[in-house]
Structure formats: C-alpha cells, structure tokens
Amino acid sequence: MITLITEQLQKQTLDELKCTRFSISLPLPDHADISNCGNPFQLVSEGASWRGLPHCSCAEFQDSLNLSYHPSGLSLHLRPPSPGSSPQEQSLSQVLSPEPPDPEKLPVPPAPPSKRHCRSLSVPVDLSRWQPVWRPAPSKLWTPIKHRGSGGGGGPQVPHQSPPKRVSSLRFLQAPSASSQCAPAHRPYSPPFFSLALAQDSSHPSAASPQSGSWESDAESLSPCPPQRRFSLSPSLGPQASRFLPSARSSPASSPELPWRPRGLRNLPRSRSQPCDLDARKAGVKRRHEEDPRRLRPSLDFDKMNQKPYSGGLCLQETAREGSSISPPWFMACSPPPLSASCSPIGGSSQVLSESEEEEEGAVRWGRQALSKRTLCQQDFGDLDLNLIEEN
C-alpha cells in the first residue's frame, strides 16, 4: 500500500499541484434569472479578481438587505429604502446605514493640556478638562458643624441645610464619581470616601439618615457612568478652589484634632502655614553669632602658667647655690633631717661629724635611686656636686 502511494506521488508534477481559487455566488432558489448571478458554483482563474465579477443583486430579502458571498468575506450591501416601504424597513435601514456625520457637528478637540496634566500620568487626554476640586486634609480646614448631636445610629449624622449657607453638609459633585453615578436611585448605599472628600455645592443635595445609615440622592443627579478615572493629587487652580479656603471662624476647638498627632505638639501655636519649628536652629548654616554672656570662656592666668612645677634636680641645685638649708620633702624621706649646729650640743663635735657622714650616704643613695628610676623628673643627676650637698 505504501509503495502504491509513493509511486503516485512520484508521477505527479508541480504543474498538476497548482492551486485554484473558487468564488461561490449563492442566489435564492426561487429566482428565475440565473444569468446575472452566474452559475451557483463558478470557477474563476487565479489571475482574475473577485472585484471584476458582475455584481450579484439577486440575493434580496424582504428587509431590503443584499447578500453576496465573495472569497474575501461576507459583505453586506444596503440599498436605500423605497418610498413605499414599510416603516420597519425604513427604521432598519437607518440603523444599519447611519448617515455620515457633518464636519461642522464634530466636537472641537480640547486644548492641549497644561504642564500639570503633562506631568501627571494618571490623567488621560479625554479627561483633561475634568479638574477635581483639590481639598487639603479634611481634619484641619472643616468649617464647624453647629448641630452636632450624639446619635445612636450607625451612619454619619450630617445636617441637611440649604446650599447658600456653605456649611459642611455633604453633597454630590456636579460630575460625581463613577461608583456613585452607576448606583440606582432606589437602592440606598453607603457613600464612597472620595465623594465625601470632594463634595461640592449642587442643586440636588443628598443627606444620610442616621437610623439606617443609608445614603440617599435624587434620581435626577444620576447620569450615565463616565469612564473611570484615577484621582491625581495635583491641586487645580480653578474658580472653585477659593471656596474651600479656611474660614475665619475656624478655631482649634471647632476643627477636630488629628488622632495621630503626638502629645507634645498639641500646645504649639496654631497657624495656617504651619511653619517649621526647626527653622531657627539651622545646624548646617555657620554664621557669626554674638557670644553668649552666660557661657564665658575662662580667662587664662599667665602668671600661673609661667610657674614651673617642682623639679627635684633643678630645685636642689638652686637651693644649694643659694645656700638655703631647705631640703625637698622626698629628700627628707630618703635621709634623716640634718641637725644644725645650733640644735646640736656644744661639746658634741663627734656627733656632728657622724651626722654629716650620714648625710653623705643619704645623698649618694638618693642619687642612685634617681638615676635608676627617673620617675620624678627626666634629668640626669650624675653631675650633682656632692661637695655642695655636704656643705648644706
């Protein structure tokens, strides 16, 4: 079986495998004239185009549609309705063949966006004209609510007041958010947070009932849902931005405090600009400040600085040269105190000689200790004059 297939494939040539394109026109079976449409299965050569074929106008239905099948796909041809046709046919033809719009009626493209919208990637081009009203943090600049009651309801209690009073009653925007517009008017729902924060005066105020906690709004304020939009934080400088400035009646007692404010900052002075408290202490800026009289530097006493500390060798030589009989305390500890001639008995010359010998031994012993340790002063005591010590 395989050999037969391979032999047949070898006999075929590339010319026999040339592809042909078919164009099929399907007329209605009850149509009499088939010459206009051609044969039901018409073979067209590859070089011929389907656009050159005669147009088949026989596939006409009662709803004024014309169908003709071509290799490029199913094309739908419409003919204008006759004046005697039924209104259903006219309405169908108007739906299927809309009139081309006039160039004068086309909407004017919006102006190029400002730099603020060029920087913000969250604002698309078609919504560049829609500027949200920018409001700062809602805890600082709310105007005081006069009728503030403690209710048992779960929903927010908002006073229902007229628009010209301009107190903080929550109302919808003129172009409210998509989630608030899409909700039906008969079903109550809780208001989204950004619709409360971006509330604006409108002709149809809406209020929240404290018992049920629902959010009611008029059906007239609900319009078809606009495309969703992400809110950008860039403030818009429009004519509506001035109405949300802080009022003169605002006080620290009227506006609620932030719950996350530290306890130490509650006694700071209240100001609109909230200046930084650390501006007066600029650590990075070096300036010439006047010296603080409370922190005076201690004056230098040069007399005390010129006084040399007691050095044993020098003082010993100086006292020896001056002929004074005062010996240093550490030398007194090394050797017994010498007895002068006035203290010794008159007839005891032998005792005086023996004491002088002890002085010599004590001085030599002290010189050896000073040479070995050199802890009291770094001076060489090898050149000490022992005769002066003996005379002393």
Curated annotation (Swiss-Prot):
Domain of life: Eukaryota
Modified residues (N-acetylmethionine): M1
Pfam families xrefs: FAM53 (PF15242)
GO terms under biological process: protein import into nucleus
Biased composition regions of type Polar residues, renumbered to the chain: 201-215
Low complexity bias locations: 85-97, 241-256
Compositionally biased spans, kind Basic and acidic residues: 278-294
Region named Disordered: 76-120, 141-167, 201-294
Modified residues (Phosphoserine): S122, S162, S232, S234, S255, S273, S299
Annotated protein name in UniProt: Protein FAM53C
Sequence similarity: Belongs to the FAM53 family.
Classification via PANTHER family: PROTEIN FAM53A-LIKE ISOFORM X1 (PTHR28567), PROTEIN FAM53C (PTHR28567:SF4)
Organism placement in taxonomy: Eukaryota, Metazoa, Chordata, Craniata, Vertebrata
